[in-house]
């Protein structure tokens, strides 16, 4: 720990004569090329897309004024790495507490605050199941948002965290889920 002023002075001293030369366009271009590769459409049209490929499809279909919104699960981490914001204030993530269920309500609020912008909510099936009721609010108010639901059989992110920390799988995947995909246009 350090006093802010003292800490900055020590960091400045440690840097010596090194200065920031500005952004490196080559690094950005290299990253975008890698991102484009993993977000490209699946080569096999009969296979299910990865979350990364879903992000790519949404990105390609979005307009410059689009705001993407997400809150919980694995999707914020993927969007953080792969989404290419086209305008300022077009990337809305709730990182702090991974609030499952905030996505649709948050998207509704964004659209109400900026009605001229397109709002795309990216949500996992677990968060969607926790709180999808704000869709009825959006319809009742005539507020158009787009909701993209990704499916990892329930709470796949929680399952991976549980298993990765030495826990046993417990009631967080829908192993026998064979329901049809949701296609709703209000």
Model-based region annotation:
Residues 16, 63, 114:
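Short conserved AdoMet
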Residues 29-106, 110:
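Active-site diphosphate/adenylate-binding microenvironment
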Residues 1-12, 77-78, 82-186:
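Thiamine diphosphate
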Residues 2-5, 9, 21-32, 45-56, ...:
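Electropositive phosphate-/nucleotide-binding environments in soluble metabolic enzymes
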Residues 13-21:
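A charged, well-structured terminal subsegment
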